[in-house]
C-alpha cells in the first residue's frame, strides 16, 4: 500500500467531491425502511467518546438532508453531529428530498437541488459556523430517459451552477428477502439497460460524474459500465453494499469471499474511485441498532477493518475517501464514533 498521511487520506475527498476543490458524483438513491427511520439521540448518547485528533481537517463526501414527518435532518442537525470533529466541507448526495410538487415529472428532481442550494447558501454565509455544508451537490436524474435526460441535467446544473457535480441513479436491486418493497427497488441489472446507457453517455458531455449505489451482487455490472465509458468518473458507494440480511444473514464470510474478487476487478478501472464507509446500515446485517448501547469506535473498527483495508489496498489511498452516510448510518452509531474509527484505521498510514 502506498504511503499516505491521515491528513491526506481523511481530507482526500475534496479531489472528487467537494465543490471549489474538484468534482463529485451521484445516482437515484437507496430506499429502505432504514432510510426513513429516526435515529434515537438518547440511545446514541450511551456511547460517549471524545473526538480523536480534533484539529485534523475532514471533508465528508456523503450525507443527506431531509424534512419528513417524524424524521428531520437539516443543516442544524448535521452541524450538531459534526461539531466534535474538524469538518471543513461536505457533499450532499440525493435522497428524494424536496422534489417539486408541480411541473414535468422528469424535472421534479430539480427541486431537491434548489433546496440544497439554499441550505448551502446559508452555510456559506458564515452565520452557522466554519463548516461549509454542501459545497458539492449530487442530484438525481432518470438516465433511462436516454437523450431526453440532457434537459434534466441542464436544469440541475442551472439550479446550482457552482455546486452541482454529478448524478446518482440507484442500481440497488436484491431479492425479496432483502428488499420486500419491490416498488422501492431499482430494476435488476439497470446498469446494463440500453436506455440507461444512452442517458449515461450525457454525463461526460455535461462534465458530471456518476455515483453508484448497488449491492455486492451487482458489482460486475458496474465494472462493465466503467469499461464501456472510460471517460466518465464513477464514485463507488458504500463498498458496494455487502448484504447481511434476508437470505444473506449469517453468511458474512461467504459474502466477503464473493465481494473481494468483484472489487478487485472493479479497481482495475482507472475511472472508478471508492467511498470507504456506509456499511453501518441495517441491510449490512450487523444489528448495531438492536444492541443495548451503540458500538464504540474500537468495536466498529474490529468489525469493519477487513473490508476497509481490502478496498484501500485494491484502489490505493489516492482513489479512496471516507464517508459518513449520515443520517442513515446514524441508526448504528454517532458521527464522533464513526470518524474516530476512520482515524484509528489510518494510524499506520503515516
Protein language model regions, located:
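N-terminal secretory signal peptides
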Residues: 1-8
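N-terminal export signals
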Residues: 8-30
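An N-terminally biased module of ancient metal coordination in phosphate/nucleic-acid-related enzymes
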Residues: 9-10, 37-129
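Short amphipathic alpha-helices and their capping/turn segments at secondary-structure boundaries
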Residues: 46-53, 74-84, 147-163, 220-230, ...
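H/E-rich (His + Asp/Glu) clusters that bind or coordinate divalent metals
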Residues: 38-44, 243-350
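Short, well-ordered coil/turn segments that N-cap beta-strands
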Residues: 54-57, 86-89, 130-136, 161-165, ...
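Conserved, mostly hydrophobic/aromatic
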Residues: 62, 90, 137, 203, ...
Amino acid at each position: 500500500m502506498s504511503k499516505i498521511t491521515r491528513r491526506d487520506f481523511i481530507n482526500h475527498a475534496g479531489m472528487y467531491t467537494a465543490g471549489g476543490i474538484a468534482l463529485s458524483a451521484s445516482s437515484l438513491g437507496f430506499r429502505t425502511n432504514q432510510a426513513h427511520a429516526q435515529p434515537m439521540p438518547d440511545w446514541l448518547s450511551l456511547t460517549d467518546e471524545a473526538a480523536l485528533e480534533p484539529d485534523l481537517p475532514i471533508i465528508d463526501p456523503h450525507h443527506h438532508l431531509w424534512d419528513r414527518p417524524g424524521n428531520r435532518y437539516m443543516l442544524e442537525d448535521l452541524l450538531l453531529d459534526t461539531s466534535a470533529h474538524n469538518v471543513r466541507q461536505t457533499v450532499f448526495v440525493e435522497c428524494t428530498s424536496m422534489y417539486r410538487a408541480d411541473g414535468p415529472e422528469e424535472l421534479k428532481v430539480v427541486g431537491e437541488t434548489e433546496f440544497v442550494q439554499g441550505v448551502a447558501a446559508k452555510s456559506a454565509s458564515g452565520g452557522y459556523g466554519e463548516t461549509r455544508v454542501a459545497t458539492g451537490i449530487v442530484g438525481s436524474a432518470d438516465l433511462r430517459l436516454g437523450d431526453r435526460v440532457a434537459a434534466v441535467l441542464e436544469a440541475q446544473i442551472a439550479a446550482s451552477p457552482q455546486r452541482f457535480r454529478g448524478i446518482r441513479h440507484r442500481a440497488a436491486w436484491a431479492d425479496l428477502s432483502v428488499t420486500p418493497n419491490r416498488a422501492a427497488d431499482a430494476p435488476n441489472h439497470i446498469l446494463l439497460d440500453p436506455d440507461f446507457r444512452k442517458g449515461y453517455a450525457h454525463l461526460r458531455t455535461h462534465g458530471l460524474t456518476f455515483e453508484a449505489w448497488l449491492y455486492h451482487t451487482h458489482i460486475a455490472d458496474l465494472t462493465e459500465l466503467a469499461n464501456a465509458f472510460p471517460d466518465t468518473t464513477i464514485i463507488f458507494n458504500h463498498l458496494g453494499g455487502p448484504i447481511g440480511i434476508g437470505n444473506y444473514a449469517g453468511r458474512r464470510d461467504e459474502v466477503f469471499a464473493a465481494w473481494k474478487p468483484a472489487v478487485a476487478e472493479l479497481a482495475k478501472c482507472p475511472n472508478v474511485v471508492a467511498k470507504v464507509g456506509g456499511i453501518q446500515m441495517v441491510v449490512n446485517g450487523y444489528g448495531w441498532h438492536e444492541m443495548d448501547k451503540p458500538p464504540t469506535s474500537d468495536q466498529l473498527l474490529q468489525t469493519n477493518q477487513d473490508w476497509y483495508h481490502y478496498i484501500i489496498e485494491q484502489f490505493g489511498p489516492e482513489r479512496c475517501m471516507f464517508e459518513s452516510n449520515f443520517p442513515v448510518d446514524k441508526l448504528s452509531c454517532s458521527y464522533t464514533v464513526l470518524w474516530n474509527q476512520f482515524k484509528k484505521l489510518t494510524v499506520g498510514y503515516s
